[in-house]
């Protein structure tokens, strides 16, 4: 049995941002795909194209933004095997698990809230269980986006694999903008600053207009072989 490291690391420069989700258009707007949504917005904002990389079992891109090299990954393994793709990138580039930021949905938070942490358990999220198992560590930062609990008699699986309702879209848009800003804050000012700034905020109300600051067009580097 793999021993899992649980001690929060000293803050390490982020090298890879991973969004968890399921591939395919049928899952594109589901609650379980919040991580994919954030990585897609980062890729567009930074000018980093994503393309399927078989060696990584995922959609991957790299380039320069915010003064440094940035790597983005969306595992194409389906949620429960996400860790295979993350491990493949870490092994290829010889990255420390503590340099990975994983973005994913969380039913324990209501829609409109997000939560940054430097380490922690999977909290019942199967994608994170896979990442922790393959990295052999819980000691890596993560950004959780709230999707709330099922309503009425709906089960958990049906809830996370269900699409956001039209009435939820405005809140989701604000949360995604805030998540992009939180990732950029992590990169520029560090995880602790980002936690203090974003964890207390509630984006469920109409007065929340937080969004990332304007960014100069990113310079994209050619892919490494």
UniProtKB/Swiss-Prot annotation:
GO terms for molecular function: peptidyl-tRNA hydrolase activity; tRNA binding. The record marks 22 as: Discriminates between blocked and unblocked aminoacyl-tRNA. Its main location: cytoplasm. NCBIfam families: pth (TIGR00447). The active site is at 32 (proton acceptor). Monomer. This is Peptidyl-tRNA hydrolase. Belongs to the PTH family. TRNA binds at residues 27, 78, 80, 126. The keyword tRNA-binding applies. HAMAP family: Pept_tRNA_hydro_bact. It comes from Synechococcus sp. (strain JA-3-3Ab) (Cyanobacteria bacterium Yellowstone A-Prime).
């Amino acid at each position: 049995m793999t021993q899992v490291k649980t001690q929060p690391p000293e803050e390490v420069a982020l090298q890879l941002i991973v969004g968890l989700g399921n591939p395919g258009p049928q899952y594109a707007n589901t609650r379980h795909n919040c991580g994919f949504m954030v990585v897609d917005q980062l890729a567009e904002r930074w000018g980093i194209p994503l393309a399927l990389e078989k060696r990584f079992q995922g959609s991957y891109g790299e380039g320069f933004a915010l003064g440094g090299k940035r790597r983005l990954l969306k595992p194409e393994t389906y949620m429960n095997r996400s860790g295979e793709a993350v491990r493949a990138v870490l092994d290829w580039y010889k990255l420390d698990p503590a340099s990975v930021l994983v973005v994913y949905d969380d039913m324990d938070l209501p829609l409109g809230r997000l939560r940054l942490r430097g380490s922690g358990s999977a909290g019942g999220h199967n994608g994170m269980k896979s990442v922790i198992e393959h990295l052999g560590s819980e000691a890596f930062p993560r950004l959780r986006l709230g999707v709330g609990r099922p309503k009425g008699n709906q089960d958990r699986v049906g809830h996370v694999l269900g699409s956001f309702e039209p009435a939820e879209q405005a809140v989701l848009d604000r949360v995604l903008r805030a998540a992009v800003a939180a990732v950029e804050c992590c990169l520029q000012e560090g995880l602790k600053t980002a936690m203090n700034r974003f964890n207390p905020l509630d984006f469920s109300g109409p007065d929340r207009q937080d969004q990332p600051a304007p960014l100069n067009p990113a310079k994209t580097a050619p892919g490494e072989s």
